[in-house]
Amino acid sequence: AVVRLKGEEVVCHVKNTGRCRELLVPGAPVFLEKSDNPNRKTQYDLIAVQKGNRLINMDSQIPNKVVEEWLLQGNLFGKDARVKREVSYGNSRFDLYIETEERKIFMEVKGVTLEENGVVRFPDAPTQRGVKHIKELCKCTKDGYEAYIMFVIQMEDVLYFEPNYATHPEFGNALSEAEKAGVHILAYTCQVRKDLINLAKPVRVYVNGKEESEEEQETVC
């Protein structure tokens, strides 16, 4: 991304693999982090962007760290839970592995930055890797593990989360099948400030899309 810094245009590395087209627009205020590596092609990393009243984290490495810290504080699985990063299962390596006296859990973490009118969606670009992870999580439930997908919404004050069927229907379909297979699907907002980021509040998840879910409810009634 090209950023105007102190009157000069500077090329910055964006620490996010998504498209981020709705965020990185001309004139958007951004936050940079200076690299201490003199051999890098770019001197700065673009780590956050302001969109309206929301400050949105752009560093794709942060969600895993935020969730790990949150779990180690005793959230979700208790204070005795042991948490490991990057543990392999089958043909995949999951972001987190959690173990308690009675439970063994794999968790995949996805950072969410795509927001429109308060609705947040994932992914913002097709992700076959994401589909593969979901299918592997379904397999591990058959071997006695618990499985979780945590969507970390890297902003505050949103309405609900749903898969981005318009961009990657296969991902949405895989997520829907995962829920049926017993995979737990969670979404949490983040409190994002200049000097911190924390998990904040749980958000309603519509794995089949909100409109589809409402139509199903009407049919049942």
Regions found by a protein language model. Name each.
Residues 37-54, 200:
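OB-fold/S1-family single-stranded nucleic acid-binding modules
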